[in-house]
Swiss-Prot record:
It comes from Archaeoglobus fulgidus (strain ATCC 49558 / DSM 4304 / JCM 9628 / NBRC 100126 / VC-16). PANTHER family: 54S RIBOSOMAL PROTEIN L1, MITOCHONDRIAL, LARGE RIBOSOMAL SUBUNIT PROTEIN UL1M. The keyword RNA-binding applies. Disulfide bonds: none annotated. InterPro entries: Ribosomal_uL1, Ribosomal_uL1-like, Ribosomal_uL1/biogenesis, Ribosomal_uL1_3-a/b-sand, Ribosomal_uL1_arc, Ribosomal_uL1_CS. It comes from the Archaea. HAMAP family: Ribosomal_uL1_A. One of its GO terms (molecular function) is structural constituent of ribosome. SUPFAM superfamilies: Ribosomal protein L1 (SSF56808). This is Large ribosomal subunit protein uL1. Binds directly to 23S rRNA. Probably involved in E site tRNA release. Protein L1 is also a translational repressor protein, it controls the translation of its operon by binding to its mRNA.
Length: 215
């Protein structure tokens, strides 16, 4: 392991304790700095979705592009927004509304047959934000996909050697936050041959609090 759990627990406890108390529940975040890896090569970049074992203390917001029965099932499954093919056209004509939607939703899923249209009409808005929908088979029940993404985070380095990810909320059990962090670090371990040579440093912090170095 890049970091042992006990060290993570102590660092998270310190970050929560050091941060000034706010009027809202703050998110606990992790920053991972990499080295000895050429991010100009696409194969070295990280771009993946990680399902956290304990969630973030609050569910992620999910948008679904669908029609007919799948759209109805998505609404029943509690999707935060369901976008029909007609609404794709409306959003394409109203970039401001499209950007607002893209910024307010954490993950999108879409029936596979709708993907080409979404890419053509909304790709310029969704792509740069890392919000291109995950395709699901036509007529598939969207509920399992929605439920999984509720507790997931997206990790994306692009061409940078640093990535940030939320790992929980300050009111969660610290052990659970640490286990979430370890799940994200597993991505780095599985991605690179010598992860200990690739990880330069790891920090944890509350949204508005000071960072605490883990390694």
């Amino acid at each position: 392991m890049i970091v042992d759990k006990d060290k993570l627990v102590k660092s998270i406890e310190e970050a929560i304790k050091n941060g000034k108390k706010r009027r809202f529940v703050e998110t606990v975040e992790m920053a991972v700095n990499l080295r000895n890896v050429d991010m100009k090569k696409p194969e070295n970049r990280i771009d993946t979705v990680v399902n956290l074992p304990h969630g973030l203390g609050k569910p992620r917001k999910i948008g679904v592009f669908a029609k007919g029965d799948t759209a109805l099932k998505a609404k029943e499954a509690g999707a935060d927004v369901v976008i029909t093919p007609e609404e794709i056209d409306e959003l394409a004509k109203d970039k401001r509304r499209a950007k607002k939607l893209a910024n307010s939703i954490d993950f999108f899923i879409a029936e596979a047959p709708l993907m080409p249209e979404i890419g053509r009409k909304l790709g310029p808005v969704l792509g740069p934000r890392g919000k291109i929908p995950q395709p699901i088979p036509p007529l598939a029940d969207p509920k399992p996909f929605i439920d999984r993404l509720r507790n997931s985070v997206k990790i994306r380095t692009r061409d940078k050697t640093t990535f940030h990810a939320p790992i929980g909320s300050e009111n969660m059990d610290v052990e659970k936050i640490a286990e979430n962090a370890m799940e994200i670090l597993k991505v780095v371990e599985n991605k690179y041959e010598n992860p200990t040579q690739v990880v330069k440093s790891v920090y944890v912090k509350k949204t508005m609090g000071p960072a605490v170095r883990v390694v």
